[in-house]
């Protein structure tokens, strides 16, 4: 739906482009990359060190998607060796606040969620 030169989506409608955006920003690697870039411009290798457990392939794919969606800027400098840096765009910076809230929620509720998972697993375990 277009109103006043602005596109307004409805993520509850099948085929709405907002679903793709939600898929991107709801991804765990996106949350961690945006958090890592919150205050810094970082090189690929620095991001990889900061985000433990992310593979080179996944970091590359996620950064490309974030760049495609206008959330991250990739800058290549003409140095030897070539220097490639990533930083959040204004849109990426505006995403940091809601993603930080999700990060904080996951930390604050970790014990409760782990307890619920353990209870669920023990309920589903076969009795001896």
Q: What kind of region is each of these model predictions?
A:
Residues 1-5, 13, 93-128:
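Amphipathic alpha-helical dimerization/coiled-coil segments
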Residues 79-80, 116:
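Conserved beta-strand edge residues that scaffold enzyme active sites
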Residues 59, 63-66:
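Basic amphipathic alpha-helical segments that dock to polyanions
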Residues 12-58, 78-79, 85-87, 93:
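N-terminal helix-turn-helix DNA-binding core of bacterial DNA-binding proteins
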């Amino acid at each position: 739906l277009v109103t006043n030169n602005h596109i307004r989506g409805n993520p509850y409608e099948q085929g709405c482009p907002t679903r793709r955006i939600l898929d991107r920003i709801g991804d765990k690697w996106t949350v961690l990359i945006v958090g890592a870039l919150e205050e810094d411009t970082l090189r690929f290798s620095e991001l990889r060190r900061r985000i433990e457990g992310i593979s080179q392939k996944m970091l590359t794919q996620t950064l490309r998607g974030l760049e495609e969606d206008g959330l991250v800027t990739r800058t290549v400098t003409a140095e030897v060796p070539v220097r490639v840096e990533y930083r959040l765009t204004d849109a990426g910076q505006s995403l940091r606040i809601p993603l930080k809230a999700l990060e904080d929620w996951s930390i604050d509720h970790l014990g409760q969620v782990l307890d619920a998972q353990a209870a669920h697993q023990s309920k589903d375990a076969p009795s001896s």
